[in-house]
Amino acid sequence: MVHGIDATQEFYGALFGWEFVPGPQQLGPYVRALLDGKEVAGIGQLPPDRHLPVAWTTYLATNDADETAETIRCCGGTVAVGPIDAAEAGRMAICSDPTGAVFGIWQAELHHGIAAAGPPGTPVWNELLTYEASAVGKFYRTVFGYEAEPVVSPDVDFLTLHVDGRPVASLHGVGTELPRDRGPHWMTYFEVADTDAAARLVTELGGRVLRPPWEGTAGRRTEGRLALVADPEGAVFTIVRSAGG
């Protein structure tokens, strides 16, 4: 959700090569982002009187949004919006886990989510940065039925979440290293062809580079070159050129 949807489209269109088409309008103006005709993201506009921080929202799939919303409440989380129908696309809600990290839930009908992942300009991973991965991991396992694979190390607090044996997201406990102005939050990783060039383009388009390019891993699953950036409205995300990509 953003404040200026037109300017945001210009930024991401220039950065990732996205095109945009109208989407469901239940929560106000909303567009779907397409890359080569395949949906890769969605951008909605906040009401003019809602002066809220702008961020990318990670959506987690469910077969029953209403039942999942109730389970979230019972497990100490919060349901801030919904569940509501998004036209014929599906049913959704905006929620937060017990530590305050915001995420969405999505019950698919006609729209089953991202149609492309891997090529430059597409989201390739989602990671929760939190105080303690093992503690909040119980919440996500209970609510969504994920299998959790921990990293066996006394120095690393990290869980990979799986569905039917397939890795789908990760939880990274960083303790007091969490930014004080953000708290626990989900991070979206977008693939790029050249991390350094993309980081320069971010600044040329009015965004900011919060951490210059470095060699590392995206969610400890794929090595590559990454940079932490923010769009002109302040939404933070990570760009990554995956090794071998």
Show where each model-derived region lies.
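N-terminal beta-strand motif that seeds the catalytic metal site of vicinal oxygen chelate
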Residues: 1-9, 55-58, 106-138, 146-149, ...
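Vicinal oxygen chelate
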Residues: 1-3, 32-33, 48-71, 75-124, 149-166, 173-178, 205-245, ...
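Residues in well-ordered beta-strands of folded domains
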Residues: 34, 44, 106, 127, ...
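Active-site/binding-pocket entry motifs
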Residues: 39, 49, 167-168, 177
